[in-house]
């Protein structure tokens, strides 16, 4: 993954913060929607799958877990593929895989076959779209990055609002097999989003400043030096604990309502409520995170969001009727939206732009292990106790614990770096150096925060969107 994975573009390109970036944001919005909403939306088919194959709650919960585990666990593989082939080809192939998995799943005759098709193949396809789209988004936006991350993250609740009732309708009209087939066709839209991912290139420079071919060949595919950063280690640990319980309530809330005796359509409407609230929570939280006095303390806002989410799970465990579940979904949608809007923004703030692609792949890999444990364990607990209260309590404790690990770890273990003075003399001197120097030192090592500040202050033109035959299809 090296310094910058995306399309192997030269470092030091100033983010356009607009232009074609809005098209990239739209593509990322759709990809995020499919990637995160799909594992939850397929839960509306669980009752039918239980009746069809004679399995338990824990068995069907594995479908969502495998989807999420593939989305997270293949992070390093996705980074290497992007580094080798570019974002656009990887996303096009990923869209085909995602569609093919659901189409084949519609012909399956056992739950294990569904694990391999709807779980592994579709999950791999979504992963090959999700990570490249995030990397491209964070290269196109800098000053507006919190807002861009919030808007793209809103794709998850928007698609959840649409896919959950749509899945219920498809199941009623065509059965779960017909529903899987139609959803597989919809996933081909990932290929369209992949076509929007055009690489950035900096303004043309003289031959003396061009990076030698030998140096390009030596770039690392995966940079493990991020583990030397204490902030990254704390974030990875906290995120891994968080995902143990974060995805459990959305997976089981529909079944919870059905077991209370409510109709399938009414039960599925709970996910629509959750998603509708989530739609507004994510961009609003992104705007708040972009405020001058909030952005330097974004990690603590993220910790608050996780505590809020965990507390909501604990309160939701006391729900005994449909009204209680509606209230739970409203507050869960707010807290879940805050977590979704901030998780990658905080990671970027911790490791910096240059190491983001390495960091996100390794974080997703660590989270994959937790995802494989969370929902299946909750399903097994439900099979043993037949009480959803315990499932929600365990999920709430896990998410709250992760918030405490992140907040306390950063407060006590991470030393704050003194703010760099921005005097007029220093700014004038830096501008003079930028104008006079013809060559950038090859092995300059700087802090990630300094890199981002330099890119913001540098009076260089924004990078232009180009079509590079080596990185585009």
Curated annotation (Swiss-Prot):
Residue spans crossing the bilayer: 18-38, 62-82, 92-112, 116-136, 150-170, 180-200, 232-252, 269-289, 298-318, 322-342, 359-379, 389-409
Domain observations: Two basolateral sorting signals (BSS) in its C-terminal cytoplasmic tail are required to direct SLC16A3 to the basolateral membrane.
Location(s) in or outside the cell: Cell membrane; Basolateral cell membrane
Record keyword Nucleotide-binding present: no
Subunit structure, as described in the record: Interacts with BSG; interaction mediates SLC16A3 targeting to the plasma membrane.
Primary location class: membrane
Full protein name: Monocarboxylate transporter 4
Gene Ontology molecular-function annotations: lactate:proton symporter activity; pyruvate transmembrane transporter activity
Protein's GO biological process: lactate transmembrane transport; pyruvate catabolic process; pyruvate transmembrane transport
Topological domain spans for side Extracellular: 39-61, 113-115, 171-179, 253-268, 319-321, 380-388
Keywords per UniProt: Cell membrane, Membrane, Symport, Transmembrane, Transmembrane helix, Transport
Region span, Basolateral sorting signal: 427-449, 449-473
Protein role: Proton-dependent transporter of monocarboxylates such as L-lactate and pyruvate. Plays a predominant role in the L-lactate efflux from highly glycolytic cells.
Gene coding for it: SLC16A3
CDD domains listed in its UniProt record: MFS_MCT3_4
Similarity remark: Belongs to the major facilitator superfamily. Monocarboxylate porter (TC 2.A.1.13) family.
SUPFAM superfamilies to which the protein is assigned, alphabetical: MFS general substrate transporter
Top-level taxon of the source organism: Eukaryota
Organism of this sequence: Gallus gallus
Catalytic activity entry: (S)-lactate(in) + H(+)(in) = (S)-lactate(out) + H(+)(out); pyruvate(out) + H(+)(out) = pyruvate(in) + H(+)(in)
Cellular component per GO, a single term: plasma membrane
Region feature Disordered, mapped onto this chain: 421-447
Bilayer topology annotation: Multi-pass membrane protein
Entry-linked InterPro entries: MCT, MFS, MFS_dom, MFS_trans_sf, Proton-linked_MCT
Cytoplasmic domain ranges by topology: 1-17, 83-91, 137-149, 201-231, 290-297, 343-358, 410-473
Keyword match NAD: no
Taxonomy of the source species: Eukaryota, Metazoa, Chordata, Craniata, Vertebrata
């Amino acid at each position: 993954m090296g310094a910058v994975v995306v399309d192997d573009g030269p470092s030091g390109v100033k983010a356009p913060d607009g232009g074609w970036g809005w098209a990239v944001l739209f593509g990322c919005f759709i990809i995020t929607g499919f990637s995160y909403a799909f594992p939850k939306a397929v839960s509306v088919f669980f009752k039918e799958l239980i009746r069809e194959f004679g399995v338990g709650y824990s068995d069907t919960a594995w479908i969502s877990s495998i989807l999420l585990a593939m989305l997270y666990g293949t992070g390093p593989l996705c980074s290497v593929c992007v580094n080798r082939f570019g974002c656009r080809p990887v996303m096009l192939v990923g869209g085909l895989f995602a569609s093919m998995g659901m189409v084949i799943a519609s012909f399956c005759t056992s739950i294990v076959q569904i694990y391999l098709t709807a779980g592994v193949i579709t999950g791999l396809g979504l992963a090959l779209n999700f990570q490249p789209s995030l990397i491209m988004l964070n290269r196109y936006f800098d000053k507006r990055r919190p807002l861009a991350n919030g808007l793209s993250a809103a794709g998850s609740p928007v698609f959840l609002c649409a896919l959950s009732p749509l899945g219920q309708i498809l199941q009623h009209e065509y059965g779960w097999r017909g529903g899987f087939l139609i959803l597989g066709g919809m996933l081909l839209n990932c290929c369209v989003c992949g076509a929007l991912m055009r690489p950035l290139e900096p303004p043309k420079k003289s031959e003396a400043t061009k990076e030698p071919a030998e140096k390009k060949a030596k770039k690392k595919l995966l940079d493990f030096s991020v583990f030397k950063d204490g902030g990254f280690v704390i974030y990875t640990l906290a995120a891994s604990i968080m995902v143990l319980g974060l995805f459990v309530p959305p997976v089981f809330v529909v079944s919870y309502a059905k077991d209370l005796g409510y109709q399938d359509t009414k039960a599925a409407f709970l996910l629509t409520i959750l998603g509708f609230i989530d739609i507004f929570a994510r961009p609003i939280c992104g705007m708040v995170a972009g405020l001058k006095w909030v952005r330097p303390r974004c990690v603590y806002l993220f910790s608050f969001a996780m505590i809020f989410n965990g507390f909501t799970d604990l309160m939701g465990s006391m729900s005994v009727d449909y009204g209680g579940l509606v209230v739970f979904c409203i507050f869960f949608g707010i807290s879940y939206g805050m977590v979704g809007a901030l998780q990658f923004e905080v990671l970027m703030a911790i490791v910096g732009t240059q190491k983001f692609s390495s960091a996100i792949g390794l974080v997703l890999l660590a989270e994959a292990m937790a995802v494989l444990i969370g929902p299946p364990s909750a399903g097994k607990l439900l099979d043993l106790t037949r009480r959803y209260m315990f499932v929600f309590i365990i999920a709430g404790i896990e998410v709250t614990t992760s918030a405490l690990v992140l907040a306390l770890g950063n407060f006590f273990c991470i030393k704050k770096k003194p703010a760099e003075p921005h005097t007029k003399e220093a700014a004038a001197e830096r501008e003079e150096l930028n104008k006079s120097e013809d060559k950038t030192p090859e092995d300059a090592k700087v802090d990630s925060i300094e890199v981002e500040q330099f890119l913001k202050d540098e009076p260089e033109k924004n990078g232009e969107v180009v079509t590079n035959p080596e990185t585009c299809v």
